[in-house]
Amino acid sequence: MFLWLAHFSNWLTGLNIFQYTTFRAVMAALTALAFSLMFGPWTIRRLTALKCGQAVRTDGPQTHLVKNGTPTMGGSLILTAITVSTLLWGNWANPYIWILLGVLLATGALGFYDDWRKVVYKDPNGVSAKFKMVWQSSVAIIAGLALFYLAANSANNILIVPFFKQIALPLGVVGFLVLSYLTIVGTSNAVNLTDGLDGLATFPVVLVAAGLAIFAYASGHSQFAQYLQLPYVAGANEVVIFCTAMCGACLGFLWFNAYPAQVFMGDVGALALGAALGTVAVIVRQEFVLVIMGGLFVVEAVSVMLQVGWYKKTKKRIFLMAPIHHHYEQKGWKETQVVVRFWIITIVLVLIGLSTLKIR
């Protein structure tokens, strides 16, 4: 919205600053951060008054039983902060902004309903897996179709393999939709599985969003894209605004979500943030880079799939408990040790992902 002020720069020179993506990106992050910090205490009080306490599963780590009753659904604060900040600092004429907000809020609505069932009916399992998959699939397919037909040229419909500049595979509409589906739905569920310890998913989301923001900035400028041999995606620079708003909102939320957590983000936050990250990766054609930078999310999801699949086949478990962060808890790691060490791993993975900008 504030971008429109740049049109009046002929009357007031200082307003020209609003046209710069970097300025608006920083302001979007600060606005979302301030929003989360300002409304965080109020959100926690309201969730507590509404008795939106987390129902902790009895088959999980016994140390988590003390978390029973901690307010959940705090992700609604994150989504509100992202939406407000993006609308204030983003370009409303850019379709990517609306697609990202649509995916964020649509998957957030699913997460909200899931959390609500857990809170009202005291059912830790929430909505059925079938209902969740149908909803997520619908959102991913609609977003994928929109992004495919927004592509300005065939270069925006290719599969890019990191580190290999010669490998760029044309996808076509079916391939594009399949890849979009796997990226958006997969990341949504992976982040949700990661969100099992205080702050574990929140900070990695910040790191990955920041990394993708750099790719979006480069892809949205033709000269940078050509120099770095990235596909030029017209309008992708506005995606930076969304990414930095996500960073700010999550950092503000982390203030209250750090151990010992005063509030959990719940599915309303985790499902939405994961889907949003996946959508950003699809827009800038960096699905494989997301796998690298979001390696923590991938490992968490794979650990669950391996555990379930192996148990069904052999009645034995690969890990002491899944997702894998619980495995390390069972091995004697303190919760804060698991969280900080996984943060460090994510920092390294994001740096590796960023290295693909030049190592080709």
UniProtKB/Swiss-Prot annotation:
Keywords (A to Z) from UniProt: Cell cycle, Cell division, Cell inner membrane, Cell membrane, Cell shape, Cell wall biogenesis/degradation, Magnesium, Membrane, Metal-binding, Peptidoglycan synthesis, Transferase, Transmembrane, Transmembrane helix
Cross-referenced NCBIfam families: mraY
Transmembrane parts of this sequence: 24-44, 69-89, 92-112, 133-153, 158-178, 199-219, 239-259, 263-283, 288-308, 337-357
EC number from the UniProt entry: 2.7.8.13
Subcellular compartments: Cell inner membrane
Membrane topology recorded in Swiss-Prot or TrEMBL: Multi-pass membrane protein
InterPro entries according to UniProt: Glycosyl_transferase_4 (IPR000715), PNAcMuramoyl-5peptid_Trfase (IPR003524), PNAcMuramoyl-5peptid_Trfase_CS (IPR018480)
Pfam family, one: Glycos_transf_4
GO terms of molecular function: metal ion binding; phospho-N-acetylmuramoyl-pentapeptide-transferase activity; UDP-N-acetylmuramoyl-L-alanyl-D-glutamyl-meso-2,6-diaminopimelyl-D-alanyl-D-alanine:undecaprenyl-phosphate transferase activity
Cofactor(s) needed for function: Mg(2+)
Entry's family note: Belongs to the glycosyltransferase 4 family. MraY subfamily.
Record GO cellular component, one term: plasma membrane
Function: Catalyzes the initial step of the lipid cycle reactions in the biosynthesis of the cell wall peptidoglycan: transfers peptidoglycan precursor phospho-MurNAc-pentapeptide from UDP-MurNAc-pentapeptide onto the lipid carrier undecaprenyl phosphate, yielding undecaprenyl-pyrophosphoryl-MurNAc-pentapeptide, known as lipid I.
Signal peptide stretch: none
GO biological process: cell division; cell wall organization; peptidoglycan biosynthetic process; regulation of cell shape
Pathway: Cell wall biogenesis; peptidoglycan biosynthesis
Protein name: Phospho-N-acetylmuramoyl-pentapeptide-transferase
Upper lineage: Bacteria, Pseudomonadati, Pseudomonadota, Betaproteobacteria, Neisseriales
Catalytic activity from the UniProt record: UDP-N-acetyl-alpha-D-muramoyl-L-alanyl-gamma-D-glutamyl-meso-2,6-diaminopimeloyl-D-alanyl-D-alanine + di-trans,octa-cis-undecaprenyl phosphate = di-trans,octa-cis-undecaprenyl diphospho-N-acetyl-alpha-D-muramoyl-L-alanyl-D-glutamyl-meso-2,6-diaminopimeloyl-D-alanyl-D-alanine + UMP
Main localisation: membrane
Coiled-coil regions listed: none
Species name: Neisseria meningitidis serogroup A / serotype 4A (strain DSM 15465 / Z2491)
